[in-house]
């Protein structure tokens, strides 16, 4: 690996590196063996772990030889093929080889990512999802439309292998990758598909494939956008999985006007901003409706011709920022632009200028949230709280914890709004629904539940707001806090409520395009 790092700066390194000899390093399989035992021991009882789980390096080499001798040229256009690896897909040695394959492929990929980031001195990274809110406040006031483009996670295995061949010419090292991809493609759930559906499982191999696939898409897409956005900076942010990045590209690429007019995608005075959380990118655009349609068409054509993948039109939808809600990340976000007039006066009143800027004012979309709460059986369609009957079998602490988790995430996300009336209404619905759920469980009334539990009823639940409001502000800071927003972000992951809303929105869009 040290040799890879020494050669990483050479331009020809990506075309000459050889990874196949690494498959026969015993230390590599010792690492993968220990990792496999750590994962399996957490999911299997101790009596199932025996001395048979000892690794034999000779067996590993024989398995690699069988993988290399497989011929996948006959399964490019068929749905199923007898694969010797499929029978022992879940066996001990196949899992060890899969772990080793991931380690080998991560070596050049990590070096490539390191030097690509080091070469961009103008980029700054923040490893936190909290940076998404400064991005929204900084970029959204200068935009009027949003493209919500979902990254397709279904792709033919041969396309993935060929994308690796662009920067790895060591063909033998890609034979195990091709074998594993076709193995999962020929699994029972994918027999009727011509493309591989990457399982949504938290394995290191598939997370690596997903991150590589997203990186490949974005690296090529950004180069195209830079060319089309002549003499304009391109800002983008990336938040893959739990490792979140936010980058602001400050340099300006200048093209001649003659060359810009020749290009199909030479956009006049464009402002394009890109942010992604998980598999849901958001592109904020300032421009006419024709520009938004061109960008949407470009994304669809880019996926179709570069990855040979038909992308459904509903996976890239556009809407105006001032009229529609957007999801970022997974929650509702409705923005109202408030114009701010600033007058500047020069010395001796020789010059006076009026500047007009926009300020982002997030709004709590109370109607869509009530509709979502009604779908999840917390209230009816008019917003009247009801008991959550499916939770009556839980303990009192579990019920309070679940309501507390939903309220905490909603409050942290929408606490930056000036107008909190809608937020307090949501709190009322959740608190009364929690009380009705406890009353239904104990077969009593809300008054009896409050009388028996007393102040302990909501002492634990809905306490996050009190912690937030009781922060030690000074008198001047407290007065300023009434005028300014304070983002209090604590969203390590999207809760089931937001995921449920996202599924409803996706289903509505799919039904709209099916009609």
UniProtKB/Swiss-Prot annotation:
Main location: plastid
Subcellular location: Plastid, Chloroplast
UniProtKB keywords: Chloroplast, mRNA processing, Plastid, RNA-binding, tRNA processing
GO biological process assignments: mRNA processing; RNA splicing; tRNA processing
GO CC, any one term: chloroplast
Gene Ontology molecular function: any one: RNA binding
InterPro entries, sorted: Domain_X, Maturase_MatK, Maturase_MatK_N
Role played: Usually encoded in the trnK tRNA gene intron. Probably assists in splicing its own and other chloroplast group II introns.
PANTHER family: MATURASE K
Family: Belongs to the intron maturase 2 family. MatK subfamily.
Protein name: Maturase K
Source species of the chain: Pinus pinaster (Maritime pine)
Lineage, uppermost ranks: Eukaryota, Viridiplantae, Streptophyta, Embryophyta, Tracheophyta
Gene name of the encoded protein: matK
